[in-house]
Each structure stands twice: as C-alpha cells, then as structure tokens.
Amino acid sequence: MLDREGFRPNVGIVLLNQKNQVFWGKRIRTHSWQFPQGGIDRGETPEQAMIRELHEEVGLLREHIRIVARTRDWLRYEVPDRYIRRDARGFYKGQKQIWFLLQLVGHDWDLNLRATDHPEFDAWRWNDYWVPLDAVVEFKRGVYEIALTELARYLPRNELRNRFLRQGVRPHEQETTFDAVPGANFELPPGGSFEPNPQTSYGLDASGKPHET
C-alpha cells in the first residue's frame, strides 16, 4: 500500500526498559542493527500496526508495554535506488512513519524473537537512548534524529543531557568523543555494523505489497 507520492505507511518503535535504555535488534542473517519497524496494513490505525509489529518482531503483547508518546506527524525517508528492486523503481519511493515511544512494563524474558514463523531479528540488546547518528545507515539517519529528538521530551530530564551525543558534542562532564563508528556509549557485537545488508532490496511481494527482502 503506497500513498500518492510513493511512500509506504509504516510505524517505528523506540522501546525503553526501566533504565531508559533502548532496544536494538539485529536483522536476521545480517550484521545490521535497527529499531523495530513495519508497514501499516490496509484498515489498520498506526497504533494497531504498532501492536502487531511489536508482537511479530519482538514477541511482546499490549500488556507488556506502556505507550508513552508518538510523533505528531509522518516522518519520511527515501530509499536509494540501489536498494530498490527493479520492478519497484519509478513508483516506490520510501517509507513514511509514525514513531512510538514505549516503556517495557514486563520483563526481558517476555521478549521473544521467534514469536512468528518469519522472524525479523536473531539477536537483541539494550543501549543508551542516544547513539552517534553517523553510525546509522545514511538514508534513515534524518528520521532517527527527528524521532529521537521529538520523543526525548518524554524521557526523565537526566536523559536530556545526552542529546549532545547525536552530533558528537561532549557535555562538560563527558570525556567521550565520537568518530564515524560507534563509540563507548554504543557497543556492537563483533562484526556488527549499521550498514545495510548488501543483499537487502526493497520491492513488492507477491500481493503487490512493498517490503524489504
């Protein structure tokens, strides 16, 4: 389902634990890490799609989370042509997203990456809310910054000081600097990166629905 401009309606999920650390998932059979996200099916509201995607990707139910906030408007990113399948080029442009900030009220053991027969992730970890955005795949970087910045107002005030980290600026009490790779505040497992899987392409499935492959 695409809008008139070629964007697929989508939801993004920022899931917090009780320490305000954020869930990151490793895409199955790749070294790419990202926030949970997924398309909105026809007839669904963004919240309904978020609850469905949350269960499909990380195994959580509505009772396991508290909805803290959501972005006010759609946030868009365009997918570069080299990641779009040839049969979708010319009319599929990218994703438009509503982002939700969620608080986990359950436990870590409620997370289940095998809740469905088509898992999206094969590993997960908690990390600080802010990460150096030069470590995020380039075409999603702007959306991540806008979403995290808009939703940060709903975090406890002691988390707001970390807003400097997204631009590599260190607060006075912080001695860490950030280069073009994840730094001390964001550790990836060996071999991990935010670069897209070279085999990933964006196109249409058998029903004509845009998807990542």
UniProtKB/Swiss-Prot annotation:
It is an enzyme of class 3 (hydrolase). Its EC number is 3.6.1.-. Coiled coil: none annotated. A motif (Nudix box) lies at residues 38-59. It comes from the Bacteria. Its cofactor is a divalent metal cation. Residues 185-213 are annotated as: Disordered. CDD domains: NUDIX_Ap4A_hydrolase_plant_like. Residues 6-149 form the Nudix hydrolase domain. GO terms for molecular function: pyrophosphatase activity. The keyword DNA-binding does not apply. Keywords: Hydrolase. Pfam families: NUDIX (PF00293). Accelerates the degradation of transcripts by removing pyrophosphate from the 5'-end of triphosphorylated RNA, leading to a more labile monophosphorylated state that can stimulate subsequent ribonuclease cleavage. PANTHER family: ADP-RIBOSE PYROPHOSPHATASE (PTHR43736), DIHYDRONEOPTERIN TRIPHOSPHATE DIPHOSPHATASE (PTHR43736:SF1). Belongs to the Nudix hydrolase family. RppH subfamily. HAMAP family: Nudix_RppH. This is RNA pyrophosphohydrolase. It comes from Albidiferax ferrireducens (strain ATCC BAA-621 / DSM 15236 / T118) (Rhodoferax ferrireducens).
